[in-house]
Amino acid sequence: MCIDASSDDIKRFMMPRPAEYTETNQRIIPINYGKIAAAALDPIEKKPLRRYKRGSMILSVGSFGCNLSCPFCQNHRISMTDAGHSVTKDVNPYQLLDAAKEARSAGNIGVAFTYNEPLIGYEYVLDCAKLIKNAGMDVVLVTNGCICEDPLKELLPYVDAMNIDLKAFNAGFYKRIGGDFETVKRTIELSQQACHVELTTLIIPGENDSPDEMRAEAEWIASLNKDIPLHISRFFPAYDYAHKTATDVRTIYELVDIARGSLNYVYTGNC
């Protein structure tokens, strides 16, 4: 997608907290377009997607950067870096499609955009998704859900499944990491109407681990659809929270029990 460089609306159009763009001959181009920092053929359950084409493999790719600043980031080596500090390979949309097709012999069903925040590379994801979908293969997003409504609606027809991070169920938490709680909720609402959606909440001791917060989260998810799977994952010390203590396994199971009071499919993660 190219937008006139004189437009004041480009950043507001894309995300509440925008990605980086560069200007070339009055064309706005994201600096990470086609820059692949990580790629692997993964089990789809690893995304995690537990109730979508179980047993399948999917070509998983990621670039660099993120539109949030989570001090607990579990994948900070690529998500919390920039173009000047990333080792990447240029892969255009047609090359990615070819790679996905070649991996069919190993059980590949499509492409998952993951590892970093894929939607800061929105234009690349959209261009690739159209080709992949047209080839009869699956498109999966693993995202924090921080994207404005209009570009999300443009992308959703080409997406088959998503895992969306619901990092906490309070606005203050999102404000601290540079996000917007209501935007993420709206992304979940729209996405679950258009494709298969699963959610993940990483439980951090003392920050989003209260029973009342999990109860409110599960009840809200159930108000959309009781069959939306929720993954409640254990935090391990990482990045700026390397000094923290890992989440007690008992806490995870207690929160899972609470969530199961409202939802049909609740899973533990990292336990």
Residue ranges and their predicted role:
Residues 54, 89, 180, 248, ...:
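Short, conserved glycine- and acidic-residue-centered signature motifs
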Residues 15-16, 26, 33, 38, ...:
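Generic secondary-structure boundary/loop-capping signal
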Residues 1-62, 76-80:
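N-terminal [4Fe-4S]-dependent radical SAM core
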Residues 23-24, 66, 204, 235:
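Generic structural motif
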Residues 54-64, 68-103:
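Glycine-rich active-site/cofactor-binding loop and its immediate structural neighborhood
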Residues 236, 246-271:
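A C-terminal junction/extension of Radical SAM enzymes
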Residues 27-28, 68-70, 121-122:
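Short active-site-adjacent helix-start/loop capping segments
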Residues 93-247, 255:
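Conserved AdoMet/S-adenosylmethionine-binding subsite of the radical SAM
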